[in-house]
Amino acid sequence: MSTSLETPSGASAGPSIVASGLPPLADLVRAGSKRTRVVYGAETSAVEDDGLARANKIKLATKLAIEYKDVQTLPPILQAQQTGPAGPKRPTQPSIAASATAGPNVKLIGGPEAEKASSSTPQAVAEPRSLVKFRHQEGFAAEGGQATSRLSQALMRKKEAREVKPEYHPEWKLTRVISGHMGWVRAVAMDPGNQWFATGAGDRVIKIWDLASGELKLSLTGHISTIRGLAVSDRHPYLFSCAEDKMVKCWDLETNKVIRHYHGHFSGVYSLSVHPTLDVLVTGGRDASVRVWDMRTRANIFTLTGHTSTVGDVKTQDSDPQIISGSMDSTVRLWDLAAGKCMNTLTHHKKSVRALAIHPTEYSFASASSGGNNIKKWKCPEGIFVNNFVGHEAIINTLSINSENVLFSGADNGTLTLWDYKTGLPFQHLKDIPQPGSLDAEAGVFCSTFDKTGTRLITGGADKTIKVYSEQA
């Protein structure tokens, strides 16, 4: 019996498959996709947003409860101190949830309520997280996408308000040139009564000049080498001098004679300073030591060691640190006079420190060396660095400060700069002109001082002259 495989025309093969007992094709596809989702869904599909958000809420709430529980409220003592009269309140800022509706500001720390409020905003949900993060980092504002935010604008305003503007200082002009020395003028000191000043030079002579007329009043001889430092006592009629002959002398200005010698330095003495309130004299020199002397008994009270090269300048004041020294080893040292020990060593300078200056009223001082950023301001007593005085690229030999916050710096190449001491900005540049007959190389400035009024500046230079600059009213 033969079976025909042909199907009648117009008949389909579908009924024959159903008749064989197999399920429909649509049911097979649906069952297969469901099974595939169950088996491979954990590896290929993204984690459900609802579960992730719920986990983040639990994590954040736990962190707030554990880590910030103790600091959410102030202790009773601090809370009582802060319950005093308050000033006018600031205008209330829009809430985080409200700002999220208008822009992409992101709350950094918040509880579940903040998360719930932000998730209820359709714009925040619809916007991709990467775009929100990018806009937050760039600081885009909600109005027009400008690259500034309220926070950055407030910080910029505060920074501008903190900038200190320099004071107005009148110009300074050269008013007198005094000749008389036969060598480089290396030291100058002012009379406490503002009547005369003394100068010392390479000709081994100390000359005393009348401040008003510029006339020579007296010449003192006794040193056998270049005079490097002079100081006049505020409480005694004494003039102190030091020189490269290792000698420190005390001159009685009533008899114009040397009444005391201070022996102890092993090499030339380059600087000295008289303590303003104690009968103490401080000297520094090429033997890398700072020596403290009893003015009356000539005893060497302390020998302060620590520098490894020539001590270029030394200053004293009545408050700590009572002794400040600058050395050719590129350091500035602050000394405790009572203990005879070093309090601090400042190593900011890269080259030799040749000059120091203490502000007459402000609790600070300045130091100078050579190279860039060569003048630095420091705050006492720890010697905290304040700022640089940028703009005088030369070897600075001398610094002076008056009570009107004018800092003067004189350099080896004959350049002079006047600074606003508060801000560190220069307001006038001058050039030392050598006297006729001198070489251009003899334009260096070695010493300087303001008079007691702060309106006249006296400098000594390599052209063997003394120059007086006056403030123009």
UniProtKB/Swiss-Prot annotation:
Annotated Polar residues bias: 1-10
Pfam families membership: WD40 (PF00400)
Alphabetical UniProt keywords: Cytoplasm, mRNA processing, mRNA splicing, Nucleus, Repeat, Spliceosome, WD repeat
Cellular component GO terms, alphabetical: catalytic step 2 spliceosome; cytoplasm; Prp19 complex
InterPro entries in alphabetical order: G-protein_beta_WD-40_rep (IPR020472), Prp46/PLRG1-like (IPR045241), WD40/YVTN_repeat-like_dom_sf (IPR015943), WD40_repeat_CS (IPR019775), WD40_repeat_dom_sf (IPR036322), WD40_rpt (IPR001680)
A biological process term (GO) from this entry: mRNA splicing, via spliceosome
Protein's name in the database: Pre-mRNA-splicing factor PRP46
Species, as recorded: Cryptococcus neoformans var. neoformans serotype D (strain JEC21 / ATCC MYA-565)
Lineage: Eukaryota, Fungi, Dikarya, Basidiomycota, Agaricomycotina
